[in-house]
Amino acid sequence: KATNFTFSKLGLLSNNEIGKFIEKYLGEVQIEDSSIPLAIVAADISTGEKVVFKTGSLATSIMASTCISSVFMPTQVDGRMLVDGAIVENVPIKVLQEMGAKVCVGVDLGSGGYRQPESMVEVLLNAFSIAIDRTIDNQGEKADVIIKPSLAGYSLTDSGNSIKLYAEGYRSGIMALDEIKLLVEKAGPSSLEVLEQKFRSWLDT
């Protein structure tokens, strides 16, 4: 379970459980502790500014980055009300390029279409997804590879299908791996070696 129902005027759901889940299984880790350089994008709902986390609590930054506006309550960070960064930059390729990435891989989570909503929350989620998906084509053009998991029949509230969703994401990633490796190899042999080492390390965790 990743959400709790709430009667807050700022959102229908709380995603505090996401933060608790991360801290339970990863501990109180910081973004800068990641073995792979990491940036997490959120948006300030009061100003419309993009907020990029490169340091600080991993749990807090993910909570902010997953707060779909109107559905989830914004996450308060340093006095700012933060929500899902997709409303300002759905495919944050520019952030990766600024960090020095030579090959950028995007993931399109809207390729499965939309399921008929069965609740007010699902109506809001569909509306959000439809609006955001209209921007992914333009922003996604900047990515070298776009991975498109088959998500037909699922919704953002399908926490009971987590294992199936993980498996589909893994399958889609493996299918794109040869293309990614080729691009990384062109970027430099050392880049390919680093990619393979990081991938093996991830598989062992």
What are these regions (language model features)?
Residues 1-205:
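Patatin-like phospholipase
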